Amino acid sequence: MSDTTLNVSLASQGYPEPAELFANLGTAPLVEHAVRNGEGLLCVDGPLVVETGKHTGRSAKDKFIVRDAETENTVWWGKTNVAMSPEHFAALKADFIKALGEKDRLYVADLFGGSQPEHRVKVRVINELAWHNLFIRTLLVRPTTDELASFVPEYTIIDLPSFRADPARHGSRSETVIAVNFTEKLILIGGTAYAGEMKKSVFGILNYLLPVKGVMPMHCSANVGPDGKTAVFFGLSGTGKTTLSADASRTLIGDDEHGWSDTAVFNFEGGCYAKMIRLSAEAEPEIFATTKRFGTVLENVVIDPVTRTIDLDDNSLAENSRGSYPIDFIPNASEENLGPVPANLIFLTADAYGVLPPIARLTPDQAMYHFLSGYTARVAGTEIGVTEPEATFSTCFGAPFMPRHPSVYGNLLKERIAKGGVKCWLVNTGWSGGKATQEGIKRMPIKATRALLNAALDGSLNSATFTKDPNFGFEVPVEVPGVDTKLLDPRGAWADGEEYDKTAQELVRKFVDNFQQFADHVDQSVRDAAPVAA
């Protein structure tokens, strides 16, 4: 049985077809299937609420790329991009096909990765779970009926949470596996129900393909101001990419993954994937409103099985609870999913050391340095006695998703900054006045962050007086209307200036040590943009 006809059948791809094949279903039927299959519950306000089991985040250590003639010299092999042999992949593929043949029911979605037609990739996703199919249909770009009629997939993703990998037979690390084969244009995901693996797999495809075409792929959010100028926000998880780009006064291009071509910044996706934990209507009204919409999928959000009400503050299932929803659920979302090339780049960091200023102006060389560094810091689990902040460097603000050498992306970025005269800013959404682990130290007020951002984006900050930071070398504004002056001086915000100096130098050394891996791949001017160790 099939609800809709595929232009290219599964059989023609060499995959078995189940008794029930549901292709390119819409939101309502997929929600019905998910509920009927026992995959989730409908919330009182409309969203579908699901649990992902033991995997509530990405399984970064279980991801592999097949090492062959195509990838041998094009992939940056190491801790992030781990090799799988073609032989192991062949065994894995054979077992995936066998597992597909044992399914009574499958869901297929033909979708685009990328909103700019000349730079998008055609992706087919095959799922055993209806809610997974709904998720990826929400997150990627949905073809029109006419486009589906002639759709020929370039890449295929098969996602089977029930599959269990065998490390001895498949070369995996555990029963969970995400295996990417750029030669066969096939991605196999097994042993995890975390839906984000699918979206990040498509991101990885585009991050591999687009630099060859001179297009800069970015792990970022992006929006456009009333003046028609685009801002791009880079940042690791938890730094505020989604929150700060969902601004009612600006048009949202997207919240997570974009390309920068000669003519546009374009969203890779057609949906958003936002953190839900402790979400509030006051702090994030646009995102909060999506938790009351039919079509939203809430992952690992606690729901009362009787009243069907949800508790966004309850982290008993996961700290990384998520919500996926179509981008048009956000007011002022761009209808085309794209905008002009950027006027401003924002590097977001949540500095748990409390030494970075709330905003700093960067030169193009400093921008490339901080892009390649990809710094943020988190507070490690204090429940096990760890009381110091933990520095995290994820190159390009998205190391797990960048198959090529970071310098490929860094040089592309530097070229585009120079070509467009783009203004670059570092924004600290983390802590001020001390380390995050110290009692009474609070995060930067979001109102202050927004005020500083607005001043940067509307151009008024350019006329401010700046002072050079002695540790990091970038320029920090002395005064900004509507922002407490004490906040702008990170050293002055500390009760003990000497303790600040010591902590700042501690962070400087971490930057310097981390950047050694890139030193031979960048110009001297970028090396000179490094923070200064005393």
Curated annotation (Swiss-Prot):
It comes from the Bacteria. Involved in the gluconeogenesis. Catalyzes the conversion of oxaloacetate (OAA) to phosphoenolpyruvate (PEP) through direct phosphoryl transfer between the nucleoside triphosphate and OAA. HAMAP family: PEPCK_ATP. It is an enzyme of class 4 (lyase). Its EC number is 4.1.1.49. This is Phosphoenolpyruvate carboxykinase (ATP). Pathway: Carbohydrate biosynthesis; gluconeogenesis. Its main location: cytoplasm. The keyword Nucleotide-binding applies. It catalyses: oxaloacetate + ATP = phosphoenolpyruvate + ADP + CO2. It holds the Pfam family PEPCK_ATP. Substrate binds at residues 58, 194, 200, 322. PANTHER family: PHOSPHOENOLPYRUVATE CARBOXYKINASE (ATP), PHOSPHOENOLPYRUVATE CARBOXYKINASE ATP. GO terms for cellular component: cytosol. InterPro entries: PEP_carboxykinase_ATP (IPR001272), PEP_carboxykinase_C (IPR013035), PEP_carboxykinase_N (IPR008210). GO terms for molecular function: ATP binding; metal ion binding; phosphoenolpyruvate carboxykinase (ATP) activity. Mn(2+) binds at residues 200, 219, 256. Its cofactor is Mn(2+). The gene is pckA.
